[in-house]
Amino acid sequence: MSRNDDEQARGSRWERETQDLSTQVEYLQEELALARRKLTETPGHVRLLEERLAATKAQVERMSEQNERLVATLKDAREQIVTLKEEIDRLAQPPSGYGVFIEAREDGTVDVFTGGRKMRVALSPSIEPESLRRGQEVLLNDALNVVESLGFERAGDVVTLKELIESDTGHPDRALVTSHADEERVVHLADSLTNAPLRAGDSLLVEPRSGYAYERIQKSEVEELVLEEVPDVDYESIGGLDGQIELIRDAVELPFLHADLFAEYELRPPKGVLLYGPPGCGKTLIAKAVANSLAKKVAEARGDDFTGGDRAKSYFLNIKGPELLNKYVGETERHIRLVFQRAREKASEGQPVIVFFDEMDSVFRTRGSGVSSDVENTIVPQLLSEIDGVEGLENVIVIGASNREDMIDPAILRPGRLDVKIKIERPDAESARDIFSKYVTTKLPLNEADLAEQGGSREACVQEMIQQAVERMYTETEENRFLEVTYADGDKEVLYFKDFNSGAMIQNIVDRAKKMAIKEFLNSQRKGLRLQHLLDACVDEFRENEDLPNTTNPDDWARISGKKGERIVYIRTLVSGKGDESGRSIDTVSNTGQYL
């Protein structure tokens, strides 16, 4: 019984073990199936993970770019905030004032002029006191301390220097100046003017509030009226005036070049020369040539090298006569004094000085001839005293030019003032040839046909052109008749174009001919100056002058044109095509009042 029980027990245990093994086998089979299924699904899962990884990387890159943009935006915003803060701080700062530096003190303070007050203020440590210059502008903070040095003032009033005032050290540090209202004032000289060559009559820039003069205006009051240079004109460029040139060279150059001989013979050099004659005949040209020639001769006498880059030095003060006149009483006289003061300064340097008054009759008229202002009553005596004052000086001569010498005050023309009087006549035929030769030269392009007529000789061609042009101008033919004048006694006289020729007219004729040659070349490609151009230019020049005599009082016109003698009362033009026009007579006007 017990044996059977044991067997049953073993059988039951085997069944249980068998069931357990079966269960384990099923579990292992399921696990194996699951493993097989997972092994089959693994590649797809890996691909899914790779896709997720790639998407994650792309998202990370996008976030990085976005972060970089945000960082840049934050930086820009920070910079803008800083800039705005600086702008706000700058706008919130109190205003800075300007002052004028006067003097530095030993204790480190400085004296400045600001707001109409003279103050002693502190100096910023960043500024060296030695770097500040008197009259210099400085910047002041809200505590009125100097924080920055600036330049010199460049705007203000223009005044005239009258006299320099020296300090205790012997150097000028102040100046006596006058304004246009003749108000005198003493001003300080800024350091910018300490070493500047200042002289009476100079124009200075003054800041009226601080009382400092900062700058010398280059165009001073006298320089507005004179041309201080050596003209580039020589005697060779003047034609037809050999006799007059010889006279003025004797009057001007000999005293300068041979002063010892003049002293030995006790001969006083002439003080002045008057050049008079009709307009356009070379008065101003001769005066310029005198200055140029005198500069060269003086340089040669002193052994200077005139051929180098430096020009020979002399001074030609070309006074613009009408501009001397000023509406303020005494201003014209003061200008004359300044002109001669400038001449004395230049002469003291040992250089020849020529004071040239062009259109002298416009300023120095006969005293008592004026009707309304009578300014000549004071201007003429001022010039007389200045010319007499030149007597004690060397190297100064006065040259006057006028086409109405009859209107100049006789006291100016007497010996001892304008000693030498040279009349510049209208050119005759021989003089006209000489003048033409200055403008019609072999260097000009000449027409081939005209050259062929002279055998290809340029010299012969030019001479033929000049000869034909002079004959056209000076022949007393019907076509050259210009005017018929009637004198007060009833006599009549026919005047030809040759009676009114001048060097300026000849130059104008040549210029017309050259312009005709240029226009012909542009239109027909025929190059070169032709004789016909000169002849046509003569006709055009004459035609332009047809109406000129009738534009003014005949008697005054005759005086200006150089026709002196009995008074002319009637003028009639005789130019072809003008026969229907009547002349112009003189009407006697009575009770003219004070204005005529």
From Swiss-Prot:
A GO biological-process term: modification-dependent protein catabolic process
GO function term, MF aspect, one: ATP hydrolysis activity
InterPro entries to which the protein is assigned, alphabetical: AAA+_ATPase, AAA_ATPase_domain, ATPase_AAA_core, ATPase_AAA_CS, NA-bd_OB-fold, P-loop_NTPase, Prot_ATP_ID_OB_2nd, Prot_ATP_ID_OB_N
Gene3D superfamilies the UniProt entry points to: 1.10.8.60, 1.20.5.170, Nucleic acid-binding proteins, P-loop containing nucleotide triphosphate hydrolases
Coiled coil: 12-94
Pfam families found in the cross-reference section: AAA (PF00004), Prot_ATP_ID_OB_C (PF16450), Prot_ATP_ID_OB_N (PF17758)
Keyword entries, A-Z: ATP-binding, Chaperone, Coiled coil, Nucleotide-binding, Proteasome
Keyword ATP-binding: yes
Entry keyword Ribosomal protein: no
Annotated residues for binding of ATP: G280, C281, G282, K283, T284, L285
SUPFAM superfamilies: P-loop containing nucleoside triphosphate hydrolases (SSF52540)
Region Docks into pockets in the proteasome alpha-ring, residue ranges: 595-596
Subunit structure: Homohexamer. Assembles into a hexameric ring structure that caps the 20S proteasome core. Strongly interacts with the prokaryotic ubiquitin-like protein Pup through a hydrophobic interface; the interacting region of ARC lies in its N-terminal coiled-coil domain. There is one Pup binding site per ARC hexamer ring. Upon ATP-binding, the C-terminus of ARC interacts with the alpha-rings of the proteasome core, possibly by binding to the intersubunit pockets.
Function text: ATPase which is responsible for recognizing, binding, unfolding and translocation of pupylated proteins into the bacterial 20S proteasome core particle. May be essential for opening the gate of the 20S proteasome via an interaction with its C-terminus, thereby allowing substrate entry and access to the site of proteolysis. Thus, the C-termini of the proteasomal ATPase may function like a 'key in a lock' to induce gate opening and therefore regulate proteolysis.
Family: Belongs to the AAA ATPase family.
Entry protein name: Proteasome-associated ATPase
Gene name, Swiss-Prot/TrEMBL: arc
